[in-house]
Design a protein with these regions (language model features):
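Thiol/disulfide oxidoreductase modules built on the thioredoxin-like
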Residues: 115-123, 128-173
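A short beta-strand-turn-helix
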Residues: 37-40, 45-66, 89-92, 135-137
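Structural microenvironment flanking redox-active thiols in thiol-disulfide oxidoreductases
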Residues: 79-120, 129-136
Length: 176
């Protein structure tokens, strides 16, 4: 009986100790990590040369609304989207909007990428999407893939496949 009494008393003392306001602060739940390329994920760090040999990096994009476009010369929907992105770049560029196109290089180009861009009237930076770049953006499941990041560098829209310029502009306007 005495042994039970001591056991209950010990458990009670230790149990109350856990409720002490002066005990170590409660652990905060760990924030769930968001995978690259998922809504809410940050703009990955990158530094690449564009097709003209100019350096382009994520550091250059701080504080801007950013549209990242993964494309290929053989991709018909990409060819239809890029002139619209150029129009948005011309319209909103002065307000802190940037566009970077990453050429998906897993298949043979149907034409020289620089000539392709010139023919479409694209003046925003275009670079090659190496395996490392594609990984940093969470992998690319299809072309075109468009990602829109807000001024804080957080992914707020991801579209796989063709999208009309007007729909993209509706995403951009509140961010700019």
């Amino acid at each position: 009986m005495l042994r039970r009494y001591v056991l209950c008393l010990s458990l009670g003392v230790f149990g109350l100790g856990g409720c002490n306001q002066h005990s170590a602060s409660p652990s905060t739940p760990a924030k769930a990590s968001i995978a690259s390329g998922e809504i809410g994920s940050p703009l990955p760090q990158f530094s690449v040369k564009d097709l003209q040999g100019r350096q382009v990096s994520s550091e250059d994009l701080r504080g801007k609304v950013v549209l990242i476009d993964f494309w290929a010369t053989w991709c018909e929907p990409c060819k239809r989207e890029m002139p619209g992105y150029q129009q948005l770049f011309a319209r909103y560029g002065p307000e802190g909007f940037a566009v970077i196109g990453f050429k998906f290089d897993t298949m043979k180009d149907t034409e020289d990428p620089a000539l392709f861009a010139k023919r479409l009237g694209v003046s925003y930076p275009l670079a090659v999407a190496t395996d490392i770049v594609r990984q940093k953006f969470g992998g690319i499941e299809g072309l075109p893939t468009t990602m829109v990041y807000d001024r804080q560098g957080i992914l707020c829209e991801k579209i796989i496949g063709f999208e009309y310029t007007g729909a993209i502009e509706k995403v951009l306007k509140p961010l700019i």
